[in-house]
Every structure is written in C-alpha cells, then in structure tokens.
C-alpha cells in the first residue's frame, strides 16, 4: 500500500521558495496515482462522464494550464460533492488532493510576473450610450425604445466586449438616434421660403420663351412648374400661392408635393388684374421635397409661391439646451460662422471622444458643415449636420484604447484610465474633474485614483453601477417580466409598483454597502434592508414594522428569518417556477451566483421532474425531488444542489414566508455533501458564511470582470488573490473591493501578447516608457 504524506507535511513541500520541480515530483508520485485510481473511471478520454480527463494531467504544469477546471476540482473534493458516495476515495486522500491543488494554484498564480490581459474594443452598450448622450447634450434618450437589448458575456454582464459588436440594424438606429437627439437640442428658426415666377420657370424650359425675368410665369393647359426645396423639421407647413388669372373663367389649380396631390381649388375666384392668395396645409418630413403647380385648363400667371412652417414657440428647456450648445439664442448667427463652428466642434469632439483631439480629426466634420452651407441651410442646420456625423463616428460609439505594438505590459494613457473609471462606476463619459486630472497626467498616481473612487462612489451617479451590477449578477433585473404583476389572484400584494420595489431593494442594499464600506459578507447575512410600505405588506410585516411610507427606508428585519440576499423577495421569486418554489433552481443559483461553482446541465436523457410527481398531486416539492433522486442519473447533481434549496423552502414561490405546503409542515432541513446539517434559512446562512472565501473570490471575480469588460483568464487569478488579501485586512469592505479593482494591474494597464503567444500565456511584465500621444 502506498505510504501517503500527512497533509501538513505535503503542504510544506510546496511552500514558497521550494523548487518548482518539487511540485511536479509530488504530483507525479502522490497526487496523480490517487486521481488515476479513484477518478479516471468517469474522467477519461475514452468514455468520459465528466469534463476533466485526469489522466491527461501528467505534470503540475498541466494543472496550471487549466486553473479554472482544477480550482473546481479542489472545491468539489473539499465540499464532498465529488466523487460519488460509492467511491472508495479515503478521507485522507480527498483532503490531501484538495489541499495540494489549492496550494499549488495559489503558489503559481503570482509567480513574480504581472498579468494585465487585453480588452476587446467595444461599443457603448445602450445604457452607456443613453447616459453619455445625457451628459454630452443634456437630453434624456429612451434607449430601450431605440436599441435592441445588449447581450451578456464574460463574467455575465452586458459590459463584455465580445458581445458588444455592431449588427447592421444598429447602424441605422444610431443615425436615427443622432437625429432625434439633435432635433431636441437645436432650435432652427421656422422655415419661410418663397419662389418667384422666374424661380419656378427654371424647371420648365419651354415656358421661358417670351417671359421676362422676374415677371409672372404663365402656365398653359397641361404645364407643370416645379421647385425643389428642403425643410428642417417634421412639421406642418402652409404653401401659399399668389396667382393671377389670364381669362374671365375660374381656373382649377392643382398643387403637388413630391408628386402627391395636396388639393385642387375647383373654382377659385381671382380678380382679373389684382393678385389673391390661396394656401394649402401639408405635413412634411425633414429633408428634400419637390413642389409642383399644375393649371390643366386655362392659362394663369403665377406671381409667387411661399412655404412657411407652422411652428410652436420652443420650450424654455429646449431654448436652454440650444444656448448651452451654441452660446447664443436661436436665429443668431456669429460674425464668422465657419470659425465659430470649428471652435464648437473642437470642444464637442473632445467630450465625445473622451480625449484631446487633433485638427485633422475636426476637418471631416467641417466638410459636412461646408456642404450644408453650400445648399443655403441656416447656421443651426449646418452645425446639426456636422454634429450628427460625430454621433455616428466610431470614435464616439466605441471605447477605443490605442494599442502599443511592442509585446509586454503598458500603462494606459490618463484619458483611457478616466474613461475606464467613468464607465465602470457611472456608465457615462468622464466628468470635468476626471478630464482635468487626465489632462494634468495625474491619474497614474494611485492615491489620486483612490480619491477619485471615493468621490465617484459618493456621487448619486454611482447608483447606476449598483443597479446594473446587482441586477445582472443576482438575476433580479427581469422581475416583473416573467411573473406578470397583473394576475388577479396576486393583486392584493403583488402589483407593478411592488415588482419595481422588489427589483430596487437589492440595489439599495448594495449601494448602501458601498456608501458605508460595509462588509461584503452583509450580502450573505445582513440584518437590514430597504423597504416601502408596499414591501412591508408584501413581506407580511404590518404588525412588526411601522412608520414606513411610500419611499424606501432603511429597516432592520424584525427577526432572523431573512438576511442578506437569501431573504430578498426578488431573488426568491426569480428562482421559482410559476406558483411553485424550486429547491433545484434556488440551490443551483446559490452554487453558481453566490459561491461561483459550476453546476453542470442535466443529462439529455434525464426524466422530467413532473414525471416523478405524476399521479401524486398531494406531494410536496421535497417529496417529489426525493422520488426524482431515486434515479441514479439524477442523484449525483441533486445531492449537491437540493439541500441548499431545501433550506429556503419556508419561502413560497413569491418569496413570502410560509410554515406549511399543501397542508403539511414545511421541512427546511438539509445536509450538505460535506456533512454539515442545517434546518431553515438561518442555519443555512451560517453554513454559507463558513464558505466565505469561495463567496469573496466569486464576488471579486464578478466585479473585476464587470469593470474590465472581458472574461477573466488564468493570469488574472494573481490579481484576484491580491485583492482578497487586501479585503481580509480591511474587514471585507465593499468600497475597498471597488478601490482595489481600480488600482489593479489589469484595470490600469494593457497587455500586448507576442504574435505567437496563446491567450492565457504569461508575458514578461516589461514596462515601456509612457506614450503621451493623445
């Protein structure tokens, strides 16, 4: 029989300072034989029943190349969720392998070389776009009505660059959005345009004979006069005709716009020599049009045609937005219009591109201005055309970081750091202070960066980070969509307003933790929350919580039934089926979202849960699952998932407390694969707190992935480990986590891999001189 090293002695074998070959020798001599003997029956390349081929790992270096997989292996062994109960693996071997893998991954994660990784160039997601437009032009744009929903990727967020590509439809939407925004900001004086008879004659060569310039245009039967014109707004317009008939009889006159008949006067009355005005009211869309006049029977003289926009006076808000952009009132034209437009564009581009711009970057938009000027557009319309070009420019729509071609790790430029920071915490462009610090080159200073993190988290705009991060991480942002809050049997306690409150509750909890630097462990066991009077009723606390109005208030739970995210109605409702709680969904949610474990999908041939309960309508969900687990195919995974869900069975499918289910007392007891037993949500939370390291690693990875906008790689584990060490020293503060993410190497620097290097390879952390090119 093999003689195994006691676990403490085995750990000493891989302490820092020991040669790397010791780890490889120990793996080959001690660890691999245990895996081959106890695990290779399922985990092999010939007939695999699991995602890992243990026999493939020949050396310790092979483990380093699959850190995520082996970290999960160690967790499964540590928590006794693997191997199956029937395995012959001894407790000593199980602990030895788990400890060795954990230590080896930890020792090799930080090998003295930094890892920054690289970020895919990505467009602004629709939230970022809307907020940036708001801060750039002062307009709140309903992006949900314009743009399709962004997908999620990476660590599970819509900030991931791999999902933020630009489908063709989105290009059209950007152009539409630019027009909408600028029409709401820029006030163009109402159109008032007139055409003389001579102007109209230019469109009909045959009518020019015998007609003097500036005199009336005589239109004979069948003749048609046309005049092109443009309007600058979707609006109503009046087309006025000043006509003179040539004979005594009445003359019907047909007016067309874009070939469409806009009305005929069947018997107009004109004085023989004087002129009388007739008008048509039409609705026109912004853009070019063609006016046509036809007198099909009798010659008449056209003295002039006038087109006037029927415009309401602009609102005070629109006038203010216009003045903010132009620095002058609508209708006022600067003495040197082109120079003024150039100055306006330079300032606007700097904000839109989130960095200083060069003259060459302004020129293309000045050409748009010139094109508009050549066709006679007013000053406001010329600027509008130029700005619309900016708003569909890739340098506005994408977060561009200029790559350094030399292999290695390179500091980001100050304006790139400012942009990363502002979109991380505010989902918008940098404000004046961040931009000023970037101009001064001060964002390379970690003390300055840390101060900016505090300033930005104290700003109300940080609510958008709390809302987005929590809603997407916990999966609560869709509450109210899946369970429609208009069902008659729910209206007493569940309405659209209650659904909105339930979505907001975890956001306020997390935002409060950020504001007060509360421990991250509050997410597991906080004895406080934020409630409205509607939620007091929803949670059935009317007799225990008083004085709460329609606005959210910080409230301490009156008992310990609820605590942290485990007691939030939004979480509990989103992890249930319709009118049926689900220990499976809830257990899997805790494992994946809270502890960061990978829960495998059910096998394709697994029988549906409903089949186990067929013919047994009086069974509780627990009894149904017990019948389901009788199938060996289902037992392994459910042994890991179900106990956690059972601990939450006192909460019904909407997250309200219950003591009975189908007339039977709720059984909320469970036993984890590790052997820990609990009964009810209070004891379940205590079990979860014992696994705080797994939780803290998971939330650190989630925040880092959200901030970077990419999937984490093996090389990022050193950063994660360093952040966790700092968290431990600072009582696991939520604000501390944000600060350490911002100060981390991957956030402040970027990595250029050698052309032949694999994505996860480590590149020498050579620092190059900072490139200050804007």
Predicted feature locations:
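Aromatic- and Gly/Pro-enriched helix-to-coil junctions and flexible linker segments
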Residues: 10-197, 297-298, 308-326, 350-358, ...
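Sequence context surrounding c-type heme c attachment/ligation sites in exported
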Residues: 17-72, 79-91, 536, 551-690, ...
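A short tyrosine-centered beta-strand micro-motif
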Residues: 237, 289-291
């Amino acid at each position: 029989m093999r003689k195994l090293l006691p676990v403490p002695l085995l750990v000493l074998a891989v302490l820092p300072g020991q040669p790397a070959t010791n780890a490889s020798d120990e793996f080959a001599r001690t660890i691999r034989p245990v895996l081959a003997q106890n695990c290779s029956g399922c985990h092999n390349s010939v007939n695999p029943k699991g995602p890992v081929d243990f026999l493939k790992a020949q050396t310790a270096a092979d483990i380093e190349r699959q850190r995520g997989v082996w970290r999960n292996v160690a967790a499964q062994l540590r928590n006794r969720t693997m191997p199956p109960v029937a395995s012959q693996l001894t407790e000593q071997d199980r602990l030895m392998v788990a400890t060795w893998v954990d230590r080896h991954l930890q020792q090799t994660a930080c090998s003295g070389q930094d890892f920054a990784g690289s970020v895919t160039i990505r467009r602004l997601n629709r939230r970022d776009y809307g907020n940036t437009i708001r801060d750039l032009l002062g307009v709140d744009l309903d992006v949900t009505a314009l743009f399709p929903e962004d997908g999620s990727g990476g660590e599970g967020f819509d900030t991931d660059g791999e999902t933020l590509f630009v489908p063709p439809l989105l290009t059209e939407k950007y152009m539409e959005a630019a027009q909408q925004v600028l029409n709401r900001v820029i006030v163009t004086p109402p159109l008032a345009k007139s055409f003389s008879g001579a102007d109209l004659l230019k469109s009909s060569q045959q009518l020019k004979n015998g007609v003097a310039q500036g005199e009336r245009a005589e239109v004979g039967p069948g003749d048609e006069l046309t005049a092109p014109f443009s309007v600058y707004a979707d609006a109503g317009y009046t087309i006025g005709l000043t006509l003179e008939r040539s004979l005594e009889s009445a003359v019907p006159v047909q007016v067309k716009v874009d070939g469409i008949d806009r009305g005929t006067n069947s018997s107009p009355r004109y004085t023989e020599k004087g002129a009388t005005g007739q008008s048509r009211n039409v609705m026109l869309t912004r853009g070019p049009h063609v006016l046509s006049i036809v007198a099909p029977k009798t010659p008449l003289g056209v003295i002039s045609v006038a087109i006037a926009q029927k415009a309401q006076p602009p609102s005070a808000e629109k006038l203010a937005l216009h003045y903010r952009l132009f620095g002058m009132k609508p209708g006022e034209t600067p003495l040197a219009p082109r120079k003024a437009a150039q100055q306006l564009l330079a300032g606007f581009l700097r904000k839109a591109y989130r960095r200083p711009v060069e003259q060459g970057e302004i020129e293309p938009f000045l050409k748009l201005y010139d094109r508009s000027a050549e066709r006679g557009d007013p000053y406001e319309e010329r600027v509008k055309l130029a700005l619309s070009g900016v708003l569909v420019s890739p340098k506005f729509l994408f977060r561009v970081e200029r790559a350094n071609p030399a292999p290695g790790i390179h500091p980001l430029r100050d304006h790139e750091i400012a942009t990363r920071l502002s979109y991380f915490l505010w989902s918008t462009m940098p404000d004046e202070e961040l931009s000023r610090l970037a101009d001064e080159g001060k964002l390379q200073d970690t003390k300055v960066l840390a101060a900016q993190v505090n300033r930005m988290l104290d700003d109300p705009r940080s609510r958008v980070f709390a809302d987005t991060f929590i809603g997407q991480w916990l999966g609560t942002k869709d509450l109210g969509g899946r369970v429609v809050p208009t069902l008659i049997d729910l209206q007493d306690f569940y309405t659209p307003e209650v659904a909105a409150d339930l979505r907001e509750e975890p956001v306020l909890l997390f935002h409060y933790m950020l504001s007060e630097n509360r421990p991250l462990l509050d997410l597991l066991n906080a004895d406080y929350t934020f409630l409205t009077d509607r939620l007091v009723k929803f949670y059935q606390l009317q007799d225990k919580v008083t004085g709460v109005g329609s606005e959210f208030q910080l409230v301490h739970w009156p008992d310990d039934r609820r605590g942290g995210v485990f007691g939030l109605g939004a979480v509990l409702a989103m992890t249930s089926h319709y009118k049926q709680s689900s220990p499976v969904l809830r257990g899997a949610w805790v494992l994946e979202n809270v502890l960061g474990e990978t829960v495998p999908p059910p096998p394709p041939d697994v029988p549906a849960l409903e089949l186990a309960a067929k013919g047994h309508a009086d069974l509780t969900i627990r009894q149904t699952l017990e019948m389901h687990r009788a199938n060996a195919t289902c037992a392994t995974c459910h042994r890991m998932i179900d106990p956690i869900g059972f601990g939450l069975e006192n909460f019904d499918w909407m997250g309200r407390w219950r003591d009975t289910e189908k007339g039977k007392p709720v059984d909320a007891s469970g036993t984890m694969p590790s052997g820990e037993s609990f009964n009810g949500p209070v004891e379940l939370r205590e079990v979860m707190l014992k696994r705080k390291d797994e939780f803290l690693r998971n939330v650190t990875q989630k925040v880092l992935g959200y901030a970077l906008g990419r999937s984490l790689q093996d090389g990022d584990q050193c950063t994660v480990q360093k952040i966790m060490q700092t968290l431990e020293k600072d009582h696991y503060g939520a604000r501390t986590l944000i600060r350490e993410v911002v100060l981390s190497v991957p956030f402040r620097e970027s990595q250029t891999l050698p052309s032949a290097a694999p994505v996860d390879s480590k590149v020498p952390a050579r620092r190059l001189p900072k490139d200050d090119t804007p």
